[in-house]
Every structure is written in C-alpha cells, then in structure tokens.
C-alpha cells in the first residue's frame, strides 16, 4: 500500500495494528497495577520495564503502519537481559503452571497471550505481503511473550506464591 492510502478495516495490516494496540493498552493496565512494587530486575522496576516495552511497541506500530521506524538490536537484548535475570532469581521451571498465582502474575499471563497474538498478526500481514518489517521486529515480538511469561512467574515468586502445575486428570 502507498503512504497515506486508506486500508481496509479487515486487512491483515489493520489486524496487526489492532493486536499491537490491544497489547500496548493492556500493558498500561498492568503498569498501573505494578506501580507499588519495589522489586527490580536489571536495575529496573516493573513499571520501568513495562514503560520501555510500551515505547518499543509504538515504534513497531509505526513500522507496521509503514513509517520509517525500526526496533534496534539493543532493545531485544534488554528483553533478553530481563528474562535471564528473572529466570536466574527463581527455581528452574519443571512444567507448565496454572495462571493466576497473583493478580499481577495473572495480568502478565494475559499480556503474554496478547503478545503472542500480536506476533501472529504481524507475521500474517508479512506473509500476505501487506507489510514489510525488519527481522529485529519479529525477534522483539517473539521475545516479548517470553518476557511476559518470566514476569508472571517472577511476580508470583516475589509474592511468595508457589507455582501449581496442571494435574492432567
């Protein structure tokens, strides 16, 4: 599509932009719920981490909309550093766990599903050849769901809530 051209409300590009907007908006709610937390990962509060992610999602939304904006590799590294620091602070995961240990943990679990949907919608738009995005954008979106998962676990861990595995019975 050409710059300034109207796009269909049902296009893959519009769906991708909508999914990114939903994720960003939901992360705003998570950020409000996280304001009172005092713990830090890589020197950043939970609120700081989410704020950085929201800023980066605006860059990705601009890129998906056709603007000359890209996510830089250092932003992916920031996500990976947070994921690694959270994982090192907790016991290793042995199985899937039930969402909802704490309110914040549950919110991060929902954010994780929004992040995965946004990633799928962006990939769908790329595969439909409606948009073109950089590899770093795809990598960032992929790692973002991992960050949300790590922060869900870390939130529960810091609150002293034990993870509960599904029973499969």
Roles of regions detected by a PLM:
Residues 1-169:
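Phosphate/pyrophosphate-binding loop motifs in nucleotide- or prenyl diphosphate-using proteins
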């Amino acid at each position: 599509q050409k710059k300034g051209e109207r796009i269909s409300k049902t296009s893959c590009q519009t769906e991708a932009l909508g999914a990114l907007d939903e994720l960003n908006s939901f992360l705003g709610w998570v950020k409000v719920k996280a304001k009172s937390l005092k713990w830090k990962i890589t020197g950043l509060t939970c609120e700081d981490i989410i704020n950085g992610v929201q800023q980066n999602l605006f860059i990705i939304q601009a890129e998906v909309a056709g603007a000359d904006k890209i996510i830089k590799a250092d932003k992916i590294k920031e996500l990976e550093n947070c994921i690694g620091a959270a994982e090192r602070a907790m016991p290793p995961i042995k199985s899937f766990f039930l969402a909802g240990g704490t309110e914040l943990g549950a919110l991060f679990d929902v954010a994780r599903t929004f992040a995965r949907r946004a990633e799928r919608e962006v990939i769908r738009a790329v595969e439909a050849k409606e948009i073109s995005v950089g590899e770093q954008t795809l990598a960032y979106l992929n790692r973002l769901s991992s960050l949300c998962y790590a922060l869900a676990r870390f939130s529960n861990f810091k609150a002293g809530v034990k993870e509960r595995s599904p029973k499969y019975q």
